[in-house]
Swiss-Prot record:
Optimum pH is 8 for OATase activity and 8-8.5 for AGSase activity. The keyword Transmembrane helix does not apply. Optimum temperature is 75 degrees Celsius (OATase activity). Its main location: cytoplasm. This is Arginine biosynthesis bifunctional protein ArgJ. Substrate binds at T160, K186, T197, E283, N405, T410. It holds the Pfam family ArgJ. It comes from Geobacillus stearothermophilus. Pathway: Amino-acid biosynthesis; L-arginine biosynthesis; L-ornithine and N-acetyl-L-glutamate from L-glutamate and N(2)-acetyl-L-ornithine (cyclic): step 1/1; Amino-acid biosynthesis; L-arginine biosynthesis; N(2)-acetyl-L-ornithine from L-glutamate: step 1/4. One of its GO terms (biological process) is L-arginine biosynthetic process. The record marks T123, G124 as: Involved in the stabilization of negative charge on the oxyanion by the formation of the oxyanion hole. CDD domains: OAT (cd02152). Independently synthesized alpha and beta subunits do not reconstitute a functional protein. Self-catalyzed precursor cleavage is a necessary step to form an active enzyme, probably by directing appropriate folding and/or topological organization of the active site. The record marks A196, T197 as: Cleavage.
Length: 410
C-alpha cells in the first residue's frame, strides 16, 4: 500500500503528550541502571492497539528491535512498550537477546498482558549487557498514569545526551469526533536515520487498522525522521513505534475515508515536530538548520539534496560561525548524485539571495551574519529542472559536539 496524501485540518495541543490520546498511560522510574534520573519507562494502552513500527537499516540491529519485530509478527497489535537507558543492548549476542525477551516477559507479567503485545526498546552505550537484576526490580516499580507528570517521567527515562524532552501532540476531527495523536522521542547524537529514527513513540486514539497504520507511518517517516541529520551516524537501535487504541470511536480509517487526510496530517505533523526537535537538540548544537529544495527532477532527488546540504560539516560549521559562505552549499549540491544543471541554480540564506541562475548576487555580509545568529536558519535552493520538492533538518556543528562525544562513556 502506498500513501501520499498530506493535507488536512489539524490543531497543535501545546500541553499534549503521549497520554493525551484516549486509552494511554505512562510511567518512568529510576531503576539505578546508571544515572540518578529516570532510566526505565513504559507506555501502556488500556486495550490491544493496532500497531506498526519502522526500524534502523543498520546491519547491527539491536536485540530489542528483534523482540519488537517478533511481537508485531503475531497479530500486529501492541499494548505496551518498555524502554530503558543508558544501555543499548546492541552487539550483545545470545545473552542480549535473552535479556530483551526477559524484559518483554517481565513487562507482560507486571501488567497482565500477552507476551506478543509488548514492544521493547533500549538506548545508550553499545556492547554492554543489561543489568537485569535492576531491571527486574525497576519494572515492578512502574505505576502508569495519565497526568503530565506521568508522561514527563516516561520522557525523562528515554533520554541520553538529550538536553530537552521531545514531545508533540495534534488533534483533528474525524466523523465529527476529536482524534488525538501524541508523541515522545529521544535523540541528540548518532542521528542520520534511514528508516525510522532514534527512538520515537507515537500514540493515537484513532480507529485504524495495523496495515493502514504501517503504510502511513512508512510514508510519513520518509518526509520527517528520515530527513534529519546531526552527525551522519546511524544508530543500531533506531525505531519508531505507533499504537492506535481506536477509542476515539470514529469509523475505521482507510485512505478512502472522507476524513483520511485529517488523520494523515495529524500523524505527519506529530512526526515532523518531533524530528525537528531532535535536529535542534543535536549534541552541542546552538541552531536548527532547515534546507528547502525545489525544482528538482523528483521529490526523492529534492529530499536527497536537502539532506546532503544539511549534513555537510562545512555548511554546519559555517552556520555555527555565522559565515554566509554559500560556496559550501554549492559544494554539497555538487557531489550529490541527483540531477543538477550547474548553469541554473538559485541559493538563498534566509531572505538574502546569494546565487541566481548560478550567478553570484550582491548581499550585505553584516545582514547575513545577523541572520545566521538566529536560532533557526533557513537555506533555500531552486534547481530549475522539475517539480520535485524536499525539506531536511539538521543543526550547526560546534566545539561542544566533540567534547560530548570524546567523553561519552566517561
Amino acid at each position: 500500500m502506498t500513501i501520499t496524501k498530506q493535507t488536512g485540518q489539524v490543531t497543535a495541543v501545546a500541553d499534549g503528550t503521549v497520554v493525551t490520546p484516549e486509552g494511554f498511560q505512562a510511567a518512568g522510574v529510576n531503576a539505578g541502571l546508571r544515572y540518578s534520573k529516570n532510566d526505565l519507562g513504559v507506555i501502556l494502552c488500556d486495550v490491544p492497539a493496532s500497531a506498526a513500527a519502522v526500524y534502523t537499516q543498520s546491519h547491527f540491529q539491536a536485540a530489542p528491535l528483534k523482540v519488537t519485530q517478533a511481537s508485531l509478527a503475531v497479530e500486529q497489535k501492541l499494548q505496551a512498550v518498555i524502554v530503558n537507558r543508558p544501555c543499548a543492548n546492541a552487539c550483545t549476542g545470545a545473552q542480549g537477546l535473552k535479556d530483551a525477551y526477559e524484559m518483554r516477559e517481565l513487562c507482560a507479567k507486571q501488567f497482565g498482558l500477552a507476551l506478543h503485545h509488548v514492544a521493547v526498546a533500549s538506548t545508550g552505550v553499545i556492547g554492554e549487557y543489561l543489568p537485569m537484576e535492576k531491571i527486574r526490580a525497576g519494572i515492578k516499580q512502574l505505576v502508569p498514569g495519565v497526568t503530565m507528570a506521568d508522561a514527563e517521567a516516561f520522557q525523562t527515562a528515554i533520554l541520553t545526551t538529550d538536553t530537552v524532552m521531545k514531545r508533540a501532540c495534534y488533534q483533528t476531527t474525524i466523523d465529527g469526533k476529536t482524534v488525538t495523536v501524541g508523541g515522545a522521542a529521544k535523540g541528540s547524537g548518532m542521528i542520520h536515520p534511514n528508516m525510522a529514527t532514534m527512538l520515537a513513540f507515537i500514540t493515537t486514539d484513532a480507529n485504524v487498522s495495523s496495515p493502514v497504520l504501517h503504510a502511513a507511518l512508512r510514508s510519513i517517516t520518509d518526509v520527517s525522521f528520515n530527513q534529519i541529520t546531526v552527525d551522519g551516524d546511524t544508530s543500531t537501535n533506531d525505531m519508531v513505534v505507533v499504537m492506535a487504541s481506536g477509542l476515539a470511536g470514529n469509523d475505521e480509517l482507510t485512505p478512502d475515508h472522507p476524513d483520511w487526510e485529517n488523520f494523515y496530517e495529524a500523524l505527519r505533523k506529530t512526526c515532523e515536530d518531533l524530528a525537528k526537535q531532535i535536529a535542534k537538540d543535536g549534541e552541542g548544537a546552538t541552531k536548527l538548520i532547515e534546507v528547502r529544495v525545489r525544482g528538482a527532477k523528483t521529490d526523492e532527488e529534492a529530499k536527497k539534496i536537502a539532506k546532503q546540504i544539511v549534513g555537510s560539516n562545512l555548511v554546519k560549521t559555517a552556520v555555527y560561525g555565522a559565515d554566509a559562505n554559500w560556496g559550501r552549499i554549492i559544494g554539497a549540491i555538487g557531489y550529490s548524485d541527483a540531477e543538477v544543471n550547474p548553469d541554473n541554480v538559485d541559493v538563498a540564506i534566509g531572505p538574502m539571495v546569494m546565487l541566481k541562475g548560478s550567478e553570484p548576487q550582491p548581499f550585505s555580509e553584516e545582514e547575513a551574519a545577523a541572520y545566521l545568529q538566529q536560532e533557526t536558519v533557513v537555506i533555500e535552493v531552486d534547481l530549475h529542472i522539475g517539480d520535485g520538492v524536499g525539506v531536511a533538518w539538521g543543526c550547526d556543528l560546534t566545539y561542544d559536539y566533540v567534547k560530548i562525544n570524546a567523553s561519552y562513556r566517561t
